[in-house]
Amino acid sequence: MNLPLASNVKHKRSTFKSSYLWNSLHAKWHYRFGKSEDAIVNWVDLLNRDSTKLRFNVVRNLIEAQAFQEARDYLERLEDNEHEESSELNYLLARCYIGQALIPQAKKKIEQAIQTKPQNSIYWDLLADCFLELGDWREAVKALDNSLRAAPKHAETNYRLGIIYAFHEEYLEALRCFQGCCQLKPHRSVYWEMKAEMHLQLEQLTDACHSFEKALRYGGTPDLAARLAYCYVQNNQIKKGIKYYKLTLKYEPDHYDSLSNLAAVYQNLNRSQDALNMLERAKNIYPKDPILLNNYAFTLVHQGRTRKAAEYYREALALTPDHPLILYNLCVCLTRKGNWQEGIDLLNLLLELDPNHSAGWALLGNIYDQTDQFDTAIDCFNKALKLA
């Protein structure tokens, strides 16, 4: 048996190590293990080799590594030569320009690519990116509509459209987009979640509940359970709401919104102690939340503990001195204790902040009525009724 000469084997190894395949694998290896600079050096070396073959895969790797200038240098060298891949060249150049925040140049290049291949949805997606960067969301929507015509089953394009519409408060259009997502990929939780949020915005509570149920089924998280609970409560399905708030708290005991909202549900059911228990847990998480302190005090009032409630109202006011609701609630508390003068002072402050606060005028009228200042009381009642 004839064995190859050692010098010949070494030569083959040397040749392989200088080959395109070896350097390409080497670059990917570097990039995979976080050595981006070494990978970029390898890729640029591959692009600088004399070859009639287009190296667009290498360019894509450079763009992914955010080496936009290196990719751009190669692509701009190719621009002078006519070839069949001009549309892809323009697309990749546009990606480089976007990466370098050169949006007008990117827009020009991607429009050139679209002229050559208008049926390519990826090109339309990039044009939409350009319009969004330029602040023209309606033109971005048109571009994404064209992308959908080119690729009708691309759920992610529908999702992008829905997000844009939702951001600009066009909730019905957004809903249609998210419905399309759910039809194309019915097991994606995030699509059902966004569909549910649009139903909520449109006050379609039953549909919102149904969509949140689907979202929870395909990707259950405590946040989704909490949103479903909120929907049920808003839809007057209180038992189901409580059930899902409890489910949320089972898996995430410190879920602040669920603790606060469940406390409100219990308070509305006259279960003040259960409400207080929830609020106590919430207070341990965020002890300086003025709205939480207000709700805590409100629950104490319903237990007849007005003195303690007043302390929490004052603590809340120290955090937000000009909050109308907290001011009013403290005034109610003071009135129940017969602390007329402080109540009058705080109500006057409230009415300076909000001169049309009808409940504030009515409460002030009641105080003056209790202190036998009847003419002043009548003036206050007239203002409460918008008669003066």
Question: Language-model segments: which ranges?
Answer:
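Canonical positions in the second alpha-helix
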Residues: 12, 43-46, 78, 112-113, ...
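Start-of-helix register in tetratricopeptide repeats
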Residues: 21, 53, 88, 122, ...
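Position-specific recognition of the canonical hydrophobic site in helix A of tetratricopeptide repeat
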Residues: 31, 63, 98, 132, ...
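Short coil turns that delineate tetratricopeptide repeat
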Residues: 17, 49-51, 83-84, 118, ...
